[in-house]
Every structure is written in C-alpha cells, then in structure tokens.
C-alpha cells in the first residue's frame, strides 16, 4: 500500500480502528425517490454529529453537502448507479471516475458489485479495473459485495440468492483489490463470521440494509463486530430514522465504544423520549 492510500485509509478507518459510514447515495440506487434525501446537507450534518466518520454519496450531492462535513469527515464517492433499479437484477453502471474522486477531495471510492446473469462478466471487468486504478492512484477502494438488489428483506434475498452468493462476492472483491468490503447480513452470526473469513484479512463492514427495528439493527452490529467487522455502512436505517443523529450515536456506541446492543438501545430510547 503506497503512501497516498495509507494516508487516506487513516481517515476512512479512524484511530480506534473503526469505520462508521453513513450511506447517503440512495438517489443513485433506489427504485424510487426517498424523501429524507431531499435535504442532503441536513442528513449529512446529523450523521456527522452522531459519530459517522465517513459519508458515502455521489459527485453531484457533495457540492451541496460539503458545508456539513467536519474536519475529520471523509468522503467516499460512489462510482456506480443502478439502471432499472426496480428489477430483481438491476444493471450496475459506472458513472464516475477516480480522477473526479480525487478532485472532489474523496478519501475513498465505492463500487456496488452485483454478480448476476448476462451482466456478470462486465461487472467483474469493472471491479478489476477500479481495483487496479485505485492501487495505481493511491485511492482506498470500498467494494460493496452485496445481493444484486438490497431493496428486500434478508430472508427474501437469502431465499433467492443464498449464502454462497454473498461469500463468493466477498472473496471476488477481496481478490480484485478492495481495501474494505461491505456486505449484507447473511441471517445469523456464524454465517457472517464466514464472510469475514472469506475476505482473508481485508476489513469488512456490515451493510444496514432495509429498514429494521432499532434493537435488531444494533444487535446485528454488535455480533458483526464480535465476528471481526471493523464497522458499518448504514443508509436507510439512519436517514429514514426519526432521529438520524441519535441512531448514528447508538451505532457508534456499539461499534466504537463496544457497548452492548441492549445498553445502546436503552440509551437511544431514553434520548428519543426526552
């Protein structure tokens, strides 16, 4: 890892060895517009106030959201968008380049990786090209090794694609140059541990996925960290929450401060009720 990548990784993964990513990129991937994202600057400010050290978003939205970034907040620029996102297997299209990420001050780039059908070969080529460019230009690469669509429940996705889909995707991303792998909750702690093992030492963060009860979200994060994850990448469960700042703070307490999920949930309930 060269000097530029090491310097950027120190910001993406903080001094405590943790990465708490708030994903505000759903305007590029969702099958419909999600109303809370209409005010991207406020959502950014809330996540930063709650303890997120990385904000994931598009090249268009950073121009609006930048004033809400703190001095230690990293930008992770999403390089891809989803074509036909309402389908079971949307097509991933690269819509930004590493040169743009560097010009915008990003500390990392992100690529959604969907292995499905006729588009899989092109996806693998794109993944490899981004991995090579990131190594050459010193840019950390966050690869999203996820189910082809994340707008369904874990149970539905597991039934449709299976655990081995996720494990193969995680390993492929690690093989082709990812510096951090983001992946879905596979349904149980033991299976998540196997995903961490498949990454073979490449840091793993757990995706938040579809909307969950707060207690379930915090529990998943606790067991993910216990299984070896270095953090989370959460979107809808933050920006669609009644208090994005409070739920981000609860996530930070579980991941960064190693509170139990029960203790963090109790504090969250108290904060929301005050």
What are these regions (language model features)?
Residues 1-26:
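N-terminal basic, low-complexity leaders that serve as flexible interaction/assembly modules and, when applicable
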Residues 12-15, 31, 65, 241-242:
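Surface-exposed loop/turn and secondary-structure junction residues enriched for glycine/proline
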Residues 19-84, 89-204, 215-230, 253, ...:
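Alpha/beta enzyme core
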Residues 225-228, 239-274:
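C-terminal helical cap(s) of enzyme catalytic domains, especially alpha/beta-barrels
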Residues 187-188, 210-214, 238-240:
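Short Gly/Pro-enriched loop/turn and capping motifs at secondary-structure junctions
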